[in-house]
Amino acid sequence: VRLWSAYAAKHENLKLEIRTKCAGHAMWDLPCLSNVIYAFTLSPQKMIDAFEKETPSAFARIVCAAEGLKKGFPVRLCFDPMLYLPSWKTDYLQLLSQIDRIFGDRMLHDGWEKLVDVSVGTFRISQEYMKKLRR
C-alpha cells in the first residue's frame, strides 16, 4: 500500500483504488491523497465465516473504514460479491445497521455522506469455471 500511495502521489491524474478486507490501521499513517481510494469489501459476518476464512470480521473492517473517514481519507464501501442465501435480506440489513452504529459510535453521523461511494456487485464466476472448481 505504501508503494502504491507513493506512486499515486507522483501521478495526480491517476485515480487508484486499493481494494481491501483489512482491519489494519497502519495505512492511515500514510499521506491522505484525494486520488487514492481505500475500498473496503464488506459482507455479513455469516458469509465471512463461511466463505472468507482467516479474514478480519465485518466489525473490524467497518471500524477501520470509519477511522479512515474520520481522518479525511477517501473511502468506498463495496458489497461485493452479494450472495443470495436464504437469509440474505436479514443479513444485509444487519450489516447496514452495524455500519450505522459504528459510524455513530465514532462521531461520524455524516459517515455515509463522507464516503466516496458505495459499490454493489454479484458473484461473477462463470458456471463453466465453477464446474472446474468443484472437480
Walk through the language-model features, giving the residues of each:
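Core AdoMet radical
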Residues: V1-C64, P74-C78, L115-T122
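Conserved C-terminal portion of the radical SAM core fold
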Residues: R61-Y129
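Acidic, Ser/Thr-rich peripheral helices and adjacent loops at domain boundaries
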Residues: K131-R135
